[in-house]
From Swiss-Prot:
One of its GO terms (molecular function) is translation elongation factor activity. It comes from the Bacteria. The lineage of its organism: Bacteria, Bacillati, Bacillota, Bacilli, Lactobacillales. It comes from Streptococcus pyogenes serotype M1. Its main location: cytoplasm. It is found in: Cytoplasm. Belongs to the EF-Ts family. InterPro entries: EF-Ts_dimer_sf (IPR036402), Transl_elong_EFTs/EF1B (IPR001816), Transl_elong_EFTs/EF1B_dimer (IPR014039), Transl_elong_Ts_CS (IPR018101), UBA-like_sf (IPR009060). Keywords: Cytoplasm, Elongation factor, Protein biosynthesis. The keyword Protein biosynthesis applies. This is Elongation factor Ts. Residues 80-83 are annotated as: Involved in Mg(2+) ion dislocation from EF-Tu. The keyword Nucleotide-binding does not apply.
Length: 346
């Protein structure tokens, strides 16, 4: 039997990332053969990862990396927020964003096949991380955005890395692009422009807005407040030329009824049309970047502000950890609590 020295254990730990006891056991089982011990730990790690495969990993971090004219934003999940702050986990997230920005995979399968600087694939890195960290660690998704030489990336992470954003802005500078990304992080747009919204989605959202107005009007009636008008339109996509022409005609009729002289109508109509557009694009304001009120200048929309500084938003990607993941009631933290309770009762 070979002597298992502290030096051997340390070397194996450095190669595998395993804990002290796991490394020592592997060396004992392989009679001190370093290569066999590494392989044994790898196999045990795969087994541990398989056992954790059905767990829900909804915590974690985003990673953002810019590589020349290519930028990547990724989401990596863990089971608990505690592990998401682990140095090994953070390093894995950052390495994932870097290798994806450099490798430009087309999908998750291609991403997981990318080779890390350590020589292992990304998939193997996640198996090993699950084994050494002790929780299910999973690579969830990524987005790649490319830009032209004259354009600017805005890379931004918020809330300790739970939100990651990449934006591309034409004109301006990197600082402006970062400000746009800060807006995106805060206001949660899902698309750039109203042209990307599905017609049925707009109708459904408009119905929800009018339902909210209906409920509000019931409350207002109880205190003798006037009812709010229902919305006829929710998006610029619904405002055809005929709708715009009719709105202008209604404004002119209103001004005439009020006795306003026609010579001043040209000064009044633009402001009223702006109000009409604002009132009838509520869905756009909720979901499209360009229609949102800019957080850095609330007198303008994002589109209007960028236009005022000769810039234009081209594209963006925003990830927030855990969005769309349904957590099971019996998650990892609950399992730990249940295990501790059982131990105390025995």
């Amino acid at each position: 039997m070979a002597e298992i020295t502290a030096k051997l254990v340390k070397e194996l730990r450095e190669k595998s990332g395993a804990g002290v006891m796991d490394a020592k056991k592997a060396l004992v089982e392989t009679d001190g053969d370093m290569d066999k011990a590494v392989e044994l730990l790898r196999e045990k790690g795969m087994a541990k990862a398989a056992k954790k495969a059905d767990r829900v990993a909804a915590e974690g971090l985003t990673g953002v990396y810019v590589h020349g004219n290519v930028a990547a934003v990724v989401e990596v999940n863990a089971e608990t927020d505690f592990v998401a702050k682990n140095a090994q986990f953070v390093e894995l997230v950052n390495a994932t964003a870097k290798v994806i920005a450099e490798g430009k995979p087309a999908n998750n399968d291609e991403a997981l096949a990318l080779v890390m600087p350590s020589g292992e694939t990304l998939a193997e890195a996640y198996v090993n991380a699950t084994a050494t960290i002790g929780e299910k660690i999973s690579f969830r998704r990524f987005a790649l955005i490319e830009k032209a030489d004259e354009q600017h990336f805005g890379a931004y992470q918020h809330n300790g890395g739970r939100i990651g954003v990449i934006s591309v802005v034409e004109g301006g500078d990197d600082a402006l692009a970062k400000q746009v990304s800060m807006h995106i992080a805060a206001m949660k747009p899902t698309v750039l422009s109203y042209t990307e919204l599905d017609a049925q989605f707009i109708k459904d959202e408009l119905a929800q807005l009018n339902h909210a107005i209906e409920l509000d009007n019931e409350s207002r009636a109880m205190v003798d407040k006037p009812a709010l008008p229902f919305l006829k339109y929710g998006s610029k996509a619904q405002l055809s030329d005929d709708v715009i022409t009719a709105a202008e005609a209604d404004i002119k009729a209103e001004l005439a009824a009020e006795g306003k002289p026609e010579k001043i109508w040209d000064k009044i109509i633009p402001g009223k049309m702006d109000r009409f557009m604002l009132d009838n694009t509520k869905v756009d304001q909720a979901y499209t970047l360009l229609a949102q009120v800019y957080i850095m200048d609330d007198s303008k929309t994002v589109e209007a502000y960028l236009d005022s500084v000769n810039a234009k938003a081209i594209a963006f990607a925003r990830f927030e950890v855990g969005e769309g993941i349904e957590k099971k009631a019996n998650d990892f933290e609950s399992e730990v609590a249940a295990t501790m309770a059982a131990a105390l009762n025995n």
